[in-house]
Amino acid sequence: MSKLQIIQSKGQYINGEWIKGNGLILESTNPASGTLLWQGNNATDEEITHACYIAHCALKSWANTSFEERARYTIAFVEQVEKNRDQLARLISLETGKPLWESQTEVSSVIGKVNLSIQAYQERTWPKQTETAEANACLRFKPHGVVVVLGAFNFPAHLSNGHIVPALLAGNTVLYKPSEHTPAVAELIIQCWHNSGLPPGVINCLQGNANCGNTLLSQDIQGVYFTGSYATGLRIHQQFCNRPEVILALEMGGNNPLVIDEVKDINAAVYHTMLSTMITAGQRCTCARRIIIPDSQTGDLFLERFAKACKLMRIGSFDSQPEPFIGPVINHVQALKHLHAQKQLIEIGGEIILPMSLLVEYTGLISPGIIDMTRAKNPPDEEIFAPFAQIYRYNHFDEAIQLANQTRYGLSAGLLSDNKDHYLQFYQHIRAGLINWNRPTTGAASSLPFGGVGCSGNHRPSAYFAADYCAYPVASMEQPLLTTPAQRLPGLVLE
């Protein structure tokens, strides 16, 4: 990539304006080539503090705006995304390495999120009124105030959008810090908000690394909406242990199980397992990390075909022809980290079936890997965010469920089975927020809640239930005329 093709940052977006940043240099690279893609600056402490002040200044007017008008701004945002659909999809692919077909799907999710969020708000946080003998019992909802959205790199447009849109609909103002790996995508999304006519200060974007995030979280804020690793989510939780008034919505991934039963259609099982483990180069929080297979001829045949499918899978840059199924992981550093994790599993007794390896130096391009952990000693309960599957064998279905539940996480779990009774048993005993039957573990719908239990979250599911953490309920007993009740309580004397 030549110097001329590097995207120069617009700056920090504060109070409806792009302001040239004064912080340390921040850069993002194309993970498929390792070349520089975008260059800008980390937000300074002063810029972050100023943005928070601006968000508070904009809050009263925005919160007092009618829901219908706030919804119109989100619809105008969608129209801007539609106009920039191709540019946004290409930028997602350039900055994350995703194949173009997957980036186009992400853009469609961004567009579809708005109407679903409007519907969810009207269903879950709409005012209600009940007449009683003494007064009107009213339920209404108010915004929390200024909320922080911390973006993730794997879906740089869609996941942040899933917090931002419900927050704005509820009347909050937003401080948005994208992932430091995907600042270019964030700038285009914010430009779409700007072009929608959204009032200044309602959304502000601050680019930066983890230090910027820490500074942002120390501000006068009323909510934090986060998608990312358990380690980071735990630090956020600990940071707010003395600030219980700040609402936290934490989505933190999982060590997700996929159980293969004695199925008839082995190829179907392989297909859904590929989509569960390898899609997005294994960088979805719902990806299956542990594949639990029967210790039988069916299990052997499944594993043989699964390994073959992984070998034949096309991997490459988003613009490669023929089109790849997956691209790279987010950068070279993460690729090396995943290879080190594979080495550690081998050292505790894991048996390599298909080694994960670096395909191109100084990039995030790695081949898919499969390791049999059945005889390993004390395997770590960690999420390896890569195209990497760990195999565990079982002798009876009860054992499969027991193995599936051997995790502190609880985001997604799946069963591939022709036996409905087995699914009912699986559903009854599995501890997870998303439980799928004969579908990939990565299959989710924005019309449903999205979140996990255990170390996967803090019981604040997003997607359709995001409205719940973007506003708080206010209960009121109301009577338009001040009167003395006909029957007074004993012991009270009035003149």
From Swiss-Prot:
InterPro entries: Ald_DH/histidinol_DH, Ald_DH_C, Ald_DH_CS_GLU, Ald_DH_N, Aldehyde_DH_dom, SuccinylGlu_semiald_DH_AstD
Protein's pathway: Amino-acid degradation; L-arginine degradation via AST pathway; L-glutamate and succinate from L-arginine: step 4/5
Active site residues according to the UniProt entry: 251, 285
SUPFAM superfamilies cross-referenced by the UniProt entry: ALDH-like (SSF53720)
Reaction(s) catalysed by this chain's protein: N-succinyl-L-glutamate 5-semialdehyde + NAD(+) + H2O = N-succinyl-L-glutamate + NADH + 2 H(+)
Domain of life: Bacteria
PROSITE patterns xref list: ALDEHYDE_DEHYDR_GLU
E.C. code: 1.2.1.71
Keywords associated with the record: Arginine metabolism, NAD, Oxidoreductase
GO molecular function annotation: succinylglutamate-semialdehyde dehydrogenase activity
Annotated residues for binding of NAD(+): 228-233
GO biological process, one term: arginine catabolic process to glutamate
Enzyme class, UniProt record, top EC level: oxidoreductase
NCBIfam families: arg_catab_astD, PRK09457.1
Function: Catalyzes the NAD-dependent reduction of succinylglutamate semialdehyde into succinylglutamate.
HAMAP family: Aldedh_AstD
Family: Belongs to the aldehyde dehydrogenase family. AstD subfamily.
Protein name: N-succinylglutamate 5-semialdehyde dehydrogenase
Organism listed in the record: Legionella pneumophila (strain Paris)
Gene this chain is encoded by: astD
